């Protein structure tokens, strides 16, 4: 890793005001200095110098909810309601996927994420050891969990796989991999199964990653079965007493929003997937006002259909304004906070990533602002949210290692990945 100096860049630290003509000094895997050039400790020498005169540096983006390997199913089943999409298309196809398929499906996802500025992601799927192996090779940071569909896990084999995932991979990849347990949703797991998973997670010292209140159908189904809404049910069962990352949270009452805030639940808002599946629009304005930690996720590429967090952040900001009729909701800085620090907090990583501050992990991206759609730079944060594209990301650094420079990914062989993914596209 060594020492890296990024000079002459505009810095969006998230934790403070924008810094013009700043420098960032990286010592191995940590940020050593972030600020004006004059403040760099005298005598500090770098092994690698990056001239970033036309660049903006900001924390790496955090994709708070996705299913990386589902990139294999991009454009496979579109324009369908969620229930039909899952039960008639996705789940039958997934039954035919093997470990190697998951590995290569994950690698194409990681390539896409690196190229569009994501440095950390939260993932729920199966054959998660294959996902973890791909993450180690790519150099990204990830929170991984085995997806646990309780109604299909009568022998507890999936739960056992989830436990093995935690024990074998938590802290792997120089600490870049963390783990959770992943009960799929309240309508695909019985209360008894949810309780068992929560108790297991508590014993392992990890949190939970769960889909929650994604569709109106889910809410009605859970109410009909158990006499409570999804949020009320998981709260009653004690799940929310653990660290919880809850994906979607589209259909919520005022009382449920208060519960999420009180229990410090991290919400992964997935606007583009929710729009495409016509699941609804999450009450982001109300959640933020109540103090809920709202992060941003893409969901899987099979329902988005991309993993571009730059685009997702723009959608999150614009959708919140359009649905409320209030143009002041989710201003540019708030959107960037949601895509970085709030994502880190939702994954329990806010002490290490999410802002550019000395002492934190060196996870950052450089965005090339010398683009016609980013000129003039009247407001750097506004340009990043409302005008930037994922393809504007020039450099990606994770844990002090340069994963992409001048748009070239150094840790993955794109042509090999394309060939493998194309070969597996029609499997089964």
UniProtKB/Swiss-Prot annotation:
Keywords: Hydrolase, Metal-binding, Zinc
EC numbers, comma separated: 3.5.4.28, 3.5.4.31
Catalytic activity: S-adenosyl-L-homocysteine + H2O + H(+) = S-inosyl-L-homocysteine + NH4(+); S-methyl-5'-thioadenosine + H2O + H(+) = S-methyl-5'-thioinosine + NH4(+)
Domain of life where this protein originates: Bacteria
Gene3D superfamilies (UniProt xref): Metal-dependent hydrolases, Urease, subunit C, domain 1
Similarity section: Belongs to the metallo-dependent hydrolases superfamily. MTA/SAH deaminase family.
Cited function: Catalyzes the deamination of 5-methylthioadenosine and S-adenosyl-L-homocysteine into 5-methylthioinosine and S-inosyl-L-homocysteine, respectively. Is also able to deaminate adenosine.
Protein name: 5-methylthioadenosine/S-adenosylhomocysteine deaminase
Lineage: Bacteria, Bacillati, Bacillota, Clostridia, Moorellales
